[in-house]
Amino acid sequence: MPQYRSRTTTQGRNMAGARALWRATGMKDEDFQKPIIAVVNSFTQFVPGHVHLKDMGQLVAREIEKAGGVAKEFNTIAVDDGIAMGHDGMLYSLPSRDIIADSVEYMVNAHCADAMVCISNCDKITPGMLMAAMRLNIPVVFVSGGPMEAGKTKLAEHGLDLVDAMVIAADSSASDEYVAEIERSACPTCGSCSGMFTANSMNCLTEALGLSLPGNGTVVATHSDRRALFERAGHLIVDLCKDYYERENANVLPRSIGNKAAFENAITLDIAMGGSTNTILHLLAIAQEAELDFTMEDIDRISRYVPQLCKVAPNTQKYHIEDVHRAGGIMSILGELARGNLLNVDCPTVHSPTMADAIAQWDITQTGSAEVAEFYKAGPAGIPTQTAFSQSTRWQSLDGDRADGCIRSVEHAYSKEGGLAVLTGNIAEQGCVVKTAGVDESILVFEGTAYVTESQDQAVADILADKVTAGSVVIVRYEGPKGGPGMQEMLYPTSYIKSKGLGKSCALLTDGRFSGGTSGLSIGHVSPEAAAGGAIGLVKTGDKILIDIPNRSINVLLEDGELEKRRAEQDAKGWKPELPRPRKVSSALKAYALLATSADKGAVRDLKKLESLQ
């Protein structure tokens, strides 16, 4: 029988000192026989998706105590990608994922916690905590802070979000007053940005992985229904703890729940809902922590047969995450996938014996439960606030239209092929990714002329200076995990391309990555990256590039042997993977770059690189 990890510090005469310190935190004699559960919070006043989490940790802690456990809360960092966007702050975003994973490991292992409740929300926090959960492999439940309500203004007929503010700001035809109105209306409440951006995509994927409760990805942060998710998580983690440590049920551990079939479910959901391309990067990294053989090849294979069943901002202006919830949330998308025989329904979850059981209970098209129907009617109030659980607004009806609603059936899919695709070719030999859900059908096959920039800063300046014209393929290189370092998001360049009216006549190709708010012909994660010697570093301005999404290919159109000739010329000059532009890089980022892999490996640390330094 597995032993409670916490007994290392709470049992035996030699642990008198440790117990004395535990007592100083408020523990009493009877507590030393209970499981010690880490409440991993990520509250910060820097991030709207986390600004309301201050009291959530103690809410979960009180429920853990009611269920017979001891709760100990700690905090980890959280970077707001939107605020860090467009300047050197973005260099720190992706590396923060590893710091979050490490900090959770350090705290949980140093204090021998038995289990965790992870309170996450925004872009790198959920994946960082998922990496830690798989690394530690102790019972865990995820509960996120929830999505922001979509913005409302009389000046726009559709819901607003962060991207609207970015795009309109660069539109020279928009008045200062109009820009100010959009800015003030775009992000009205606490919560993760309201579209199917990276944060919400990842929180939705925790449902598909089986590590969170139904509704985790879609109940808006302001709604009173979200309180129950935190409360249930507190009770559930104690049950999972006892299942593992007292009943020897290893099926409740993260690696048992998050097996390869579950990861296939997660990427299937991601493709079906047109999620952020960042999710590919994160799923690859999380799978490596779980020691799973889950690769870009698996993602490419699945992307070829999964249809797009949901279309949400930034891929459309019609729907935001609050609309997905009204249509039945993630459980209803999973239900449609299951009916199309596209889902592994035998996977266990933290709350149900199998995914099939979960779908039967929570899919609004299957269940007859009035309680479930009421749950998915939880909607936005349209009142600006930073307070969680502050409103109880309900939609008058559910959106169960699977032919023309927010969520579609397989038979009525938005497209037969899903919202994400992996492309390969002579400038991306190990692959690159594109969110096809955000690409206009007219440019699924696109031949354009390369316009090469050596940094995001240069790309932004040239786009705003009208140096980029229709028919261009803007290449932004040396922005990968190693080259950046930190693999910056390119939301400003793609937003400015749209501002200039080039959204359907230009492409952007980078070894960096994109915000979940990006749409258009934006292709990222080119691997190998330029700083690792990738062929994207050999492209010259004026080269012709052919992008063929239906055939999953991307190539620079050169005579046979031309790339090899360019590489030989480059090598003859003594080329090294150094930055071809001035950029101040801290020692912390240099350490990250030293071990970072390219995006096709999840941009994780490769400790084998240390061997070459010894």
Swiss-Prot record:
Keywords, ordered alphabetically: 2Fe-2S, Amino-acid biosynthesis, Branched-chain amino acid biosynthesis, Iron, Iron-sulfur, Lyase, Magnesium, Metal-binding
Record-level Gene Ontology MF annotations: 2 iron, 2 sulfur cluster binding; dihydroxy-acid dehydratase activity; magnesium ion binding
Residues bearing the modification N6-carboxylysine: K124
Binding, [2Fe-2S] cluster: C122, C193
GO annotations of cellular component type: cytosol
SUPFAM superfamilies cross-referenced by the UniProt entry: IlvD/EDD N-terminal domain-like, LeuD/IlvD-like
Reaction(s) catalysed (UniProt annotation): (2R)-2,3-dihydroxy-3-methylbutanoate = 3-methyl-2-oxobutanoate + H2O; (2R,3R)-2,3-dihydroxy-3-methylpentanoate = (S)-3-methyl-2-oxopentanoate + H2O
Intrachain S-S bonds: none
Pathway noted in the entry: Amino-acid biosynthesis; L-isoleucine biosynthesis; L-isoleucine from 2-oxobutanoate: step 3/4; Amino-acid biosynthesis; L-valine biosynthesis; L-valine from pyruvate: step 3/4
Active site residues according to the UniProt entry: S515 (proton acceptor)
Pfam family, one: ILVD_EDD_N
Assembly: Homodimer.
PANTHER family membership: D-XYLONATE DEHYDRATASE, D-XYLONATE DEHYDRATASE YAGF-RELATED
Stated name of the protein: Dihydroxy-acid dehydratase
Organism placement in taxonomy: Bacteria, Pseudomonadati, Pseudomonadota, Gammaproteobacteria, Cellvibrionales
